[in-house]
Amino acid sequence: MALLTVLCYPDSRLHKVAKPVAQVDARIKKIVADMADTMYEAPGVGLAATQVDIHERIVVIDVSDEQNELMVFINPEIVWTSSETKSWREGCLSVPEFYDEVERPAEIRVKALDIDGKEFEIEADGSLAVCLQHELDHLQGKVFVEYLSIFKRTRISQKMKKRAKELIGQR
């Protein structure tokens, strides 16, 4: 399998809204496998296709301690959220080394297709609920830093642009 390049904030491609997957076929299964390899290599607990410049509604997640329980969500949608919210410290492979508190619904229910194209629903709380909401935001073109104050967003954007220039200068 191939490792994919993860886009870094504030890359405008992170703001593209992903399109639904028409059919779960060999191409989609290869994308899922490559996304999983990329997520585990990073290492991360979730990855949306948007983050690797593939603008289709695909998410891979593994919040297990051993990183051996891959979950695949194709065309995921949140069908229910609890009224109770919880604040979690979030990070993102597209915003490396930056973490901050984001408040989200404490529990959710998601409907999606699995790797075989079969529909399923899952109820989630805790880290899985947070990760699902975070990754589904990516499919809508939203990055977690957009929940932060304009001051924090601007500071993160400036630091990420500076880091990108430094990386280009090292080549």
UniProtKB/Swiss-Prot annotation:
GO terms for molecular function: metal ion binding; peptide deformylase activity. Its EC number is 3.5.1.88. Gene3D superfamilies: Peptide deformylase. The active site is at residue 135. SUPFAM superfamilies: Peptide deformylase (SSF56420). Keywords: Hydrolase, Iron, Metal-binding, Protein biosynthesis. Fe cation binds at residues 92, 134, 138. It comes from the Bacteria. Its cofactor is Fe(2+). Removes the formyl group from the N-terminal Met of newly synthesized proteins. Requires at least a dipeptide for an efficient rate of reaction. N-terminal L-methionine is a prerequisite for activity but the enzyme has broad specificity at other positions. Belongs to the polypeptide deformylase family. This is Peptide deformylase. It comes from Polynucleobacter necessarius subsp. necessarius (strain STIR1).
